[in-house]
């Protein structure tokens, strides 16, 4: 189904979610929906030019962020998610959900009911 919208958003999962957070500091997107995107760059990924996602929120509009995160996801530990909320982002936390619970039904971590709920809430937020 085609949808008409005046809002340009970026969505991403995992590393793509981290980059969706980083995009908040730019001017190309009005909303950002990271799905289990890392709030802090993992140590192994750090290098020249690899900025922190929270730095982008500090220069952009953190209220333009709706993050979807599972509470059992080692890539997004609770303290990091708390940092994201403290920066002004809205976070949908799914109790007991692990990394990748929304986007790929073939993954062991997939949770159909939570995935459906997350997509409904994200689409409502984007439409709103």
Regions found by a protein language model. Give the residues of each.
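N-terminal cap/leader regions of alpha/beta-hydrolase-fold enzymes
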Residues: 1-128
């Amino acid at each position: 189904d085609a949808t008409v919208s005046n809002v340009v958003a970026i969505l991403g999962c995992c590393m793509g979610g981290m980059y969706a957070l980083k995009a908040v500091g730019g001017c190309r997107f009005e909303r950002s929906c990271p799905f289990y995107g890392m709030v802090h760059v993992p140590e192994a990924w750090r290098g020249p030019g690899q900025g922190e996602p929270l730095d982008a929120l500090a220069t952009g509009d953190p209220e333009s962020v709706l993050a979807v995160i599972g509470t059992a996801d080692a890539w997004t530990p609770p303290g990091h998610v708390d940092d994201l909320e403290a920066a002004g982002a809205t976070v949908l936390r799914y109790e007991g959900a692990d990394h990748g619970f929304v986007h790929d039904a073939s993954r062991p971590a997939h949770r159909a009911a939570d995935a459906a709920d997350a997509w409904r809430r994200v689409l409502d937020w984007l439409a709103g």
